[in-house]
Amino acid sequence: MKYIKKTGILKMLIVVTILCVGCSSKENTENNKPESIQNEIAKIEDKSCAYENADWGSMGQQEMNQTTAQWYQLWDDELNSLWSRLSDELDSETKAEVLEEQRAWIERKEKHVKGAGMEAFGGSLQAQLENDTAKDMTRARTYILAGYLANVRNENFIIPSEIQKNIDMADPSLNEIFEKFEGQWIFDKERGACVGVEKTETCAYGVEGSNWTVWVTGGDIISDLDVYGYTENNIIFKVTHDDYDAYYELLFNMDNLLSFAYGTSLGAMDDIIVCD
């Protein structure tokens, strides 16, 4: 009789142990389940908001430069992390396509950052302007790569509409910027002289191999091949000659008139044409 009782108790212990092991195994499996890309990016956004809501008014310029650098680094680290995982998980053909896209984005970002920094004219604000632009563009690109990775993993990934607006504004293409300036802008009515910004395929002075050509009546002809930097508000060109460099800037001034500046250095583009 005692043997039967002991056997029964032993069986109960075995069953309980199996159930506990099963529960523990299930719990461990759930704990080891990778975090969704949606949640991962949401956490980065929370950290980003902390920077956005910092007490900027109490900071000196040097501290603002450092803080914007850290803010940019937050998104750059996440971008690199996503790219590392994408490199491992994409098929070879798609990886090659995304790599080409990524290289084009890096080139575009570098030109944007240059263009933003130039607006400080070499002042102490330059680093902050460059960091802000790099951060905004990197944040936008992070969402693109996050979407790619979520797709590979068959996860849902939704970009809130407000964030999507910010993303669209952060990374305009060079083509979109040229379209803002497209046209023939008269600066001397008597001579009919103007600054022309035209698609190369329809331009009488089109530069071979380019998409956009910029020309001045009786003056220089440049193209998108000469773009040195740009923002959503301006385009800066650089043309290297044997004994000097020529710089040009295309923008709308404070009166919303097209302005085309020229000089032999970034800080001295003093030869300015203003079109009506």
Model-derived features with residue positions:
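Short beta-strand segments that buttress and anchor functional surface loops
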Residues: 186-187, 213-216, 235-242, 260-263
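Bacterial N-terminal signal peptides that target proteins for export
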Residues: 2-13
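N-terminal helix-cap/turn-to-beta initiation motif at the start of protein domains
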Residues: 168-184, 201
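C-terminal motif of bacterial Sec signal peptides marking the signal peptidase cleavage site
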Residues: 19-22
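N-terminal alpha-helical modules
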Residues: 27-172
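Short, surface-exposed coil-to-beta transition loops
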Residues: 113, 128-129, 191-192, 198, ...
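Short, exposed beta-strand-loop hairpins at the edges of beta-sheets
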Residues: 248-269
